[in-house]
């Protein structure tokens, strides 16, 4: 599968999930470990703009940032995790994220290192 097909598939899945969820806002996942969780700052705003323009969602243009161990992650149907390098989850962080995913949350992970 080419990178372009994977990217388009990711957009389609993301838009599908957003369209059928009652809450439409997305959040950026903040994590420990020095993996640059804040990198690629235009990716999620561009996705939000695309979805708002093309499938009539009404998401806030600027996504919120939530920490992986926070109960606030349950307020968002989709979390976006980006960066490269080390990612560290404490046992509590991992349990919180696991509970989020088991409860139906969706985690989109973008390793933006740029190598093929």
Q: What kind of feature is each model-predicted range?
A:
Residues 10-18:
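Bacterial N-terminal signal peptides
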Residues 21-78, 82-85:
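Aromatic-Pro/Gly-enriched surface loop or interdomain linker
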Residues 1-11:
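Bacterial N-terminal signal peptides that target proteins for export
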């Amino acid at each position: 599968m080419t990178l372009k097909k994977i990217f388009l598939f990711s957009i389609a899945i993301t838009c599908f999930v957003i369209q059928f969820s009652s809450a439409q806002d997305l959040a950026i996942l903040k994590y420990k470990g020095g993996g640059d969780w804040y990198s690629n700052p235009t990716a999620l705003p561009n996705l939000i703009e695309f979805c708002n323009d093309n499938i009539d969602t009404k998401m806030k243009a600027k996504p919120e940032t939530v920490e992986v161990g926070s109960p606030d992650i349950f307020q968002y149907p989709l979390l976006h995790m980006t960066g490269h390098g080390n990612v560290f989850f404490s046992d509590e962080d991992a349990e919180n994220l696991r509970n989020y995913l088991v409860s139906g949350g969706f985690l989109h992970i973008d390793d933006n290192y740029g190598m093929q």
